[in-house]
Amino acid sequence: MSDNRHQNLAVIGHVDHGKSTMVGRLLYETGSVPEHVIEQHKEEAEEKGKGGFEFAYVMDNLAEERERGVTIDIAHQEFTTDEYEFTIVDCPGHRDFVKNMITGASQADNAVLVVAADDGVAPQTREHVFLSRTLGIDELIVAVNKMDVVDYDESKYNEVVSGVKDLFGQVGFNPDDAKFIATSAFEGDNVSDHSDNTPWYDGPTLLEALNGLPVPQPPTDADLRLPIQDVYTISGIGTVPVGRIETGVMNTGDNVSFQPSDVGGEVKTIEMHHEEVPNAEPGDNVGFNVRGIGKDDIRRGDVCGPADDPPSVADTFQAQVVVMQHPSVITAGYTPVFHAHTAQVACTIESIDKKMDPASGETQEENPDFIQSGDAAVVTVRPQKPLSLEPSSEIPELGSFAVRDMGQTIAAGKVLDVDEA
């Protein structure tokens, strides 16, 4: 058993390439799903004419998702290997779920990219790799999945590997840093055991590759940053903000400040899993009570930090963005909604400072008139109402964002510099 070394793992890739099945298979192979649950899912899947979906059913707990055969919200599932305890951040694959992907991937240490052998690099494969790169995921394990569908053909595998390597080159991922694995999540090939169906494949199994990931360094030595997800009023306690600690440590007795609401006080109690704890660390989901703070004083999107070094509030900020899809062009004055940690704020792009080569990061053009899909750029942004952000070089967890408009994610980016209000 691992000594509780923990990894948050994103599972990314195009819709229907087998992400949910892969997650179900990982849970199944590591003994994280009781046998009777799998049997029950099997019966249910067969009744609905979706035989073979039983592993994916493990993931899709919501009835609505089951009916549609689509994974919706980010599902946190856990499994243990020889080296690590993994929490899977199952990243949905459908178009309108990219926002979930961004909030999910930003919580992930590493990612498994699932690419179907019969389909290769698809639009969302491209997009998810782009996002992972922008959001600071360094290690990608690539599962070339559905090998059973292509009769375990080595040439198909090689074709997909070379397509993915080309894609990595375009977004500045080093292809040599990625591990490629020939898998069938459905049949279980090369997930936990080496498969006889792929005698030509001599690389690691998926579980071996996961065990070989580098140890994430929890950002405990950074300043406390805790984006607020919700604020509750609990009788007998009072106002209880809830959120996940991104960096630093929260102790009872700490003096904290909430920004941009600009209120603060002393932490009286901290609760985790309905038990009171003296302190909490990065990755912990906590509810806490602060002396003198009322329900209307703070809101979702506020960030809690130390009173003597409160979270930054941006008057303007400079950011590096990658435009993923926009029907026309983006010019100065454009005001979409920025999603950063738990905040959603309309922000105006005041200026496009330079256009860059997405792969090398070199400047291609100073002060261009516009940017469009596929472009990377540095822009200056003015939030329409106060927004707490940090430069991603200092606190990466509070330095990435998604840009949404017209019901879709049009860009993702990271904060380079904050000009404080």
From Swiss-Prot:
Main location: cytoplasm
tr-type G domain residues: 4-220
Annotated region described as G1, given as residue ranges: 13-20
Keyword tags: Cytoplasm, Elongation factor, GTP-binding, Hydrolase, Magnesium, Metal-binding, Nucleotide-binding, Protein biosynthesis
EC category name: hydrolase
Annotated positions binding GTP: 13-20, 90-94, 145-148
InterPro entries recorded: EFTu-like_2, G_TR_CS, GTP-eEF1A_C, P-loop_NTPase, Small_GTP-bd, T_Tr_GTP-bd_dom, TRAFAC_GTPase_members, Transl_B-barrel_sf
Region (G2): 69-73
Annotated region described as G3, given as residue ranges: 90-93
GO CC annotations on file: cytoplasm
Domain of life: Archaea
Catalytic activity, as annotated: GTP + H2O = GDP + phosphate + H(+)
Region (G5) residue spans: 184-186
UniProt region (G4), positions on chain: 145-148
GO function terms (MF aspect): GTP binding; GTPase activity; translation elongation factor activity
Residue sites binding Mg(2+) per the record: S20
EC number: 3.6.5.3
Gene3D superfamilies in alphabetical order: P-loop containing nucleotide triphosphate hydrolases, Translation factors
Pfam families noted in UniProt: GTP-eEF1A_C (PF22594), GTP_EFTU (PF00009), GTP_EFTU_D2 (PF03144)
Entry keyword NADP: no
Localization, UniProt: Cytoplasm
Function: GTP hydrolase that promotes the GTP-dependent binding of aminoacyl-tRNA to the A-site of ribosomes during protein biosynthesis.
NCBIfam families with a match to the protein in the record: EF-1_alpha, PRK12317.1, small_GTP
Family affiliation: Belongs to the TRAFAC class translation factor GTPase superfamily. Classic translation factor GTPase family. EF-Tu/EF-1A subfamily.
Protein name stated in the entry: Elongation factor 1-alpha
